[in-house]
């Protein structure tokens, strides 16, 4: 399943570059981070900043799931708090406040964003970053984004592209489901093409290459959110996250979120047998029965499949997930349902459409279009995006 040999020399993170650059000397700094904001020695950036005498740590900001990443699900907000050991406020940016306010930024010389993305359009951390850029522009605070690896690589672009009118907190910009960019590259892309215009500095990594998966970087993996515990979760996530828009479990409440897909009314053997006829590259669908401990179908035995990625470079996460969805819907027409609003604070649009970036994919599935035809319908947008993103790539 590994795509290349493990790195013999590790990638040097943007946060490590920042802390040795002197850029923060004699500055009052705010930091947007969570438990994955560590360096190669597992040192957290908040601790390092707090222990650096020439840097004044003045505020901490947390994204979705909280600064401690202890909150499980979507639309469960975290409250503002304080860090008694450091005497600084801890502001939640997944609450009634999504964008830092003037009061939160008061007195700051810079706002640093050090977040680990997972490589999918719908992951909210990149929009928390975008909101920080907007706040920095409004209130005259420079924003520094310390770059981190895209854990699923920077070469592949896949899945449907967000269409205007379907923006939400899981999609603010017209990018494909799997965008193949680092968080620093996305900052540059959003700031320019989104017309934000913040005073932005991206501190690049050293040694990262676009073909790398996270294991190739030589860096320790810390789960950026509760339901992306492993790199394997991140690899399948751009596709199987679509099941959040249905009444089928995406494996939350199990030890394999986004790899296990199913529901109490799914025949696991029949599903896997049919999926094998698709002959999709780089993947095996194994029939399983699992019991989620929470969320959809909690404490119920669910039939379904586990998605085993055999070759990451051949695997097509979104096409594979659409195939699973199509077959579950076809085999269980009376039981399968599209999830109804609200979802991520959108009260009118269908949750599946918000995730997919438009209503097109849902309509294609309902019309019975072949999965391969659906896949080919994305390719023109991918070609355009490759051209659009090129000026903003750092590696």
Regions found by a protein language model. Name each.
Residues 9-55:
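N-terminal phosphate-binding or glycine-rich loops at protein starts, especially the Walker A/P-loop
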Residues 56-65, 146:
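Short internal beta-strands
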Residues 69-73, 144-166:
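Glycine-rich, charge-decorated loop segments at or immediately adjacent to ligand/cofactor-binding or catalytic sites
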Residues 73-108, 120:
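Glycine-rich oxoanion-binding loops at beta->alpha junctions
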Residues 117-129:
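Glycine/threonine-rich flexible loop motifs
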Residues 166-240:
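Conserved anion/nucleotide-ligand pocket segment
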Residues 208-293:
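Glycine-rich, aromatic-lined ligand/substrate-binding cores of catalytic
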Residues 262-375:
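Conserved functional hotspot residues or short segments at active or partner-binding sites
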